Amino acid sequence: ALTGTLTVSANGDVKILPSGRMQAATDLSAQSGRNIVNEGTVTAGGALALNAPGTVSNAGAMSSAGNASVVARQLDNRGAFTAGLQADGSISPLGALSVQVNSLQNAGTLMAGGNATVTADALGLSGGKFVAGGALTLDANGAITNRAGSVYGGSVFLRASSLDNTGGKLTSGGALTVNVAGAVDNTAG
């Protein structure tokens, strides 16, 4: 939908191939009965909303000029996922990212110009980059693993049962709050 809103709804998988493109001038919403798999390019000129009972997998590029949200069992990001990306390449501080999953695996780049909130049972951030220009909230019932990963927020709030930040970077431009019930490994972090 080059001039308006695009809504995609499927009982099965929603899949964008490497040469494929799904684009909306304003809001883009994809609802799958199973999984959402992006190996190409997904672009929303407004908000981006992804909802699947299975996995949202991104090995390509996903972006929204406005807010982006993911509700799924798992988010597996090996590509670039950006909330607040403008047509001129700048990042808007109004682009917030909200992720509600059982498991987040990020070996790629997650970026929000504004706030970013992840609510999950477990977060795997190893080898990836996660950047929020505003407040970054990582709220995990289980473990957060950030081996050789890079996490930055204008402020950072992290809650987990354990934290493995071996060789990782956890950086805040302001307040940094870490609430871990169990073990913390910050070797070379």
What does each model-identified segment do?
Residues 1-8, 12-23, 27-30, 34-38, ...:
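Extracellular beta-strand scaffolds
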